[in-house]
Amino acid sequence: MSYYQHPLDVTGLPSWKALEEHRLAMQHFSMREAFKADPTRFDDLSVSCSGLFLDYSKNLITPETRTLLVNLAREAGVEQAARAMFEGERINASENRPVLHTALRRPMGDSVMVDGKNIMRDVHTALAQMTDIVTRIHNNLWRGFSDKTITDVVNIGIGGSFLGPQLVSEALLPFTQHGVRTHYLANIDGSEFREVTAKLNVETTLFIISSKTFGTLETLKNAQAARNWYLGKGGTEEKLYRHFIAVTSNKQAAVDFGIREKNIFPMWDWVGGRYSLWSAIGLPIALAIGMSNFKDLLSGAYSMDQHFLSEPFESNMPVLLAMLGIWYHNFWGAQSYAFLPYDHYLRNFVKHLQQMDMESNGKSVRQDGTPVSCSTGPVIWGGVGANGQHAYHQLLHQGTPLIPADFIVPVVSHNPVADHHEWLYANCLSQSQALMLGKTREEAEAELRAKGLSEAEVQRLAPHKVIPGNRPSNTLVMETISPGRLGALIALYEHKVFVQGVIWGINSFDQWGVELGKELGKAVYNQMTRFDAAPAEDASTQGLIDFFRGRHRG
């Protein structure tokens, strides 16, 4: 029986019941003591693949916990669900669509059938189209209206058309080729438009409009503003095609805008926005780093795909991360999860993960429309490196909530400065160590006495210096950030999110809450700008509309 047609009530499975009992037995488990008792714990609770090394030994688990979590994944049908996704079954049940972002990174010669058609031909045709335009721009064959070469590319898109490409193009800045700079215009905010365009020369700027329907409000408004900016700075209608290209499934709308059909790249219904950076949505990435590096990005993701499909669950990196998340969210009550990358180039990784995870698994009904039987979708947050240590890490160490964390760090920096990276790496390891070890009352008192404080002062200050410890974390290490390893890293978390969605029985590939916001936004706009519009449905919204109108009247 297909999981997406008849999802299981996971809380009724024997493996779920076994985990509930195990959780009670783990109430007083100490990671400190576990490491003392088992010198092989690190080796037993770590795994590597696709250029990534995962240490998950600093978790509230034993080998028995891992066995029970893996049993739950098997009993919930994760293996069958993964096969269904990769083979093109319509696992996005609410929209009756296949989910095939994984096809975008499969090699030429593979076959994936959708409605009787091998979509791999379309995938590699689009890659060839991308290669052509990247080559022309990098070889100075594509020129603007004044015959100058392209130096800047502005991607106009929002959500998945923005977050993934921005993450990758910034993470791979050391791989930038031919001096092409990428910029991103997403928000419908005049200030953002002003800040982006202020850096640009209209004669050497190319805009990419990324919108599946060519009708996304924020994207269309920014595209129209960019067009007006281009015309106002000396560009002509006749040569507009040299400065605007599109990634869309609505060819006619793009042609009507002034874009030549050969400069329109495809989008497909079987690729969701938050999983689309591997497609022509990734064109700004390819323009920045070149097609060879872009294909390495795809290859890294493909390597993780194969690991996910073939590796036993006991050593399957996406499955292990997913089930650890289930363990903390559903059995320990953790409501949020922190991601802490220790590299400046990964500073936007958390923003991409927020969409990937919360837009995917922020659901309260299962695939068949029935209410979920357990909590889903934790809050995803975090930030880059040592900055967080001087901000929110305090909450991780001494706060009352249990907040699991993933640390992500490369061994080698692209930009070595003195011993900076050694200190950065040391900070990363010491934070995960401090979360695990903490500081006992005895250790706090001994530390204060060693400073010569009176016993009264020792007793007064010691409670404040106690750090509970026993806080779980994973540490993901890679040699250095490269296109292949970054591709594997992103695919790792894509599959983690998918596995959790299967466990909860939800559809990780629709986003009806987002759609409601779009609908109401149009209604509120009309109520703000048209005095003959019906009033808002609630007094709060109407009051805020009236405040806006009053301010704009003078």
UniProtKB/Swiss-Prot annotation:
GO BP terms in the entry: gluconeogenesis; glucose 6-phosphate metabolic process; glycolytic process
PANTHER family: GLUCOSE-6-PHOSPHATE ISOMERASE (PTHR11469:SF1)
Keywords from the named record: Cytoplasm, Gluconeogenesis, Glycolysis, Isomerase
Gene3D superfamilies per the UniProt record, alphabetical: 1.10.1390.10, Glucose-6-phosphate isomerase like protein, domain 1
The family this protein is said to belong to: Belongs to the GPI family.
Pfam families: PGI
Reactions listed under catalytic activity: alpha-D-glucose 6-phosphate = beta-D-fructose 6-phosphate
Annotated catalytic residues: E359 (proton donor), H390, K518
Name of the protein this chain belongs to: Glucose-6-phosphate isomerase
Family annotation (SUPFAM superfamilies): SIS domain
Gene Ontology molecular functions: carbohydrate derivative binding; glucose-6-phosphate isomerase activity; monosaccharide binding
Biological role: Catalyzes the reversible isomerization of glucose-6-phosphate to fructose-6-phosphate.
